[in-house]
């Protein structure tokens, strides 16, 4: 059985109820639909209820990855997953099979009934996409201030509910100037919430990039870091974020492919949750064993794990997943990593330690 941590299951990535201007799906050439930029079209009706074709594929993907890897974490993301009819029932059914079920959403369709049902499951980590609490900061995600207020009102209900939550805050030339205000607004929600700012990325990201004179804002926040607690990520995360901007890109290693991979609802598998342009195989349409065996065992996988990034996509990449790399590199402790919502479960902690120990034992043998 492979010693991995998480499957990032992407369901209908082009089906969304927002049109974020920097959306990576619209920039992706991974699938024909991405080339057509369907992400900017109106959301479509779909169904993952028991007996549907989509549900059959999802069940197959989860079965294969669970049986062959015993993963403690499943992350379910889109698109916007709650556009899919039957999604809440699917989450309720699969949650008991994992130590942690991560649910990534923009929050617009998450009502009180959903929150109560998610909280009842007891092992949910919400990941909410929000660039800032003001319209100015969130403008690339909201077409107008009225829409932003509607979105933030719904998010306020989510943040107040107490479910462990990570806020994914994309840093761009509109959100970074407002970041201090955003952090001050969010710290009221308490210890169940963590904020993870990370740089906008992708081939079309230049127009959204943080301006050079905005970068010192990150160091200003660093100098008063404790004033934004308890919602801040581990300190090493902020240090690495500042380094990314000051060095104009990634110059440090990435260990993410040692921990996680991506599956799409059509069965395709990729080596890294942050890179969608490399297909390992398909666990729905192909024989399963060779595809599973290829996860972590391809030349492309080794390129991703180079001491310094070799691909342009990697050089421009820094995401909340980077806490895993910091753990492997000794920049944060296991306790610090497991203080964040996604990694708190005991079974997750155990798997993290296993992967860490296995890697460093191998490194000793190579010396």
Question: Where do the protein language model's features map onto the residues?
Answer:
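Conserved alpha-helical substructure of the radical SAM core
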Residues: 1-121, 366
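Flexible mid-to-C-terminal extensions adjoining Fe-S/redox cofactors in radical SAM and related proteins
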Residues: 1-7, 26, 30-35, 274-367
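Short cysteine clusters
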Residues: 16, 20-23, 254, 272, ...
């Amino acid at each position: 059985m492979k010693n991995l941590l998480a499957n990032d299951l992407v369901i209908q990535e082009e089906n969304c109820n927002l049109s974020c201007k920097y959306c990576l799906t619209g920039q992706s050439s991974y699938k024909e639909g991405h080339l057509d930029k369907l992400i900017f079209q109106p959301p479509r009706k779909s169904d993952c209820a028991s007996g549907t074709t989509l549900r059959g594929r999802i069940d197959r993907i989860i079965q294969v990855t669970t049986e062959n890897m015993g993963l403690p974490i499943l992350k379910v993301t889109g698109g916007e997953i709650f556009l899919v009819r039957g999604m809440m029932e699917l989450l309720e059914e699969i949650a008991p099979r994992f130590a942690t079920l991560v649910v990534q959403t923009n929050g617009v369709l998450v009502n009180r009934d959903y929150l109560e049902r998610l909280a009842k499951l007891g092992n949910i980590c919400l990941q909410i996409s929000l660039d800032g609490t003001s319209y100015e900061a969130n403008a690339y995600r909201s077409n107008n201030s009225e829409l932003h207020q509607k979105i933030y009102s719904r998010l306020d209900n989510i943040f107040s509910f107490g479910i462990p939550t990570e806020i994914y805050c994309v840093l761009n030339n509109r959100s970074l100037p407002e970041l201090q205000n955003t952090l001050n607004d969010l710290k009221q929600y308490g210890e169940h919430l963590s904020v993870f700012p990370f740089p906008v990325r992708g081939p079309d990201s230049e127009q959204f990039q943080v301006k050079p004179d905005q970068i010192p804002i990150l160091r200003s926040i660093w100098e008063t870091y404790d004033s934004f607690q308890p919602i801040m990520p581990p300190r090493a995360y902020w240090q690495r974020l500042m380094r990314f901007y000051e060095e104009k890109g990634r110059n440090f290693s990435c260990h993410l492919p040692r921990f996680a991979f991506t599956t799409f609802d059509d069965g395709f598998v990729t080596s890294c949750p942050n890179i969608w342009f490399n297909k390992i195989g398909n666990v729905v349409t192909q024989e399963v064993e060779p595809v599973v065996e290829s996860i972590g065992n391809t030349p492309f996988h080794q390129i991703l794990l180079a001491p310094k990034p070799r691909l342009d996509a990697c050089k421009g990449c820094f995401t909340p997943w980077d806490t895993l790399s910091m753990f492997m590199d000794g920049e944060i402790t296991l306790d610090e990593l497991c203080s964040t919502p996604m990694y708190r479960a005991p079974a997750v902690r155990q798997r993290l330690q296993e992967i860490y120990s296995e890697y460093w034992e191998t490194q000793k043998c190579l010396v």
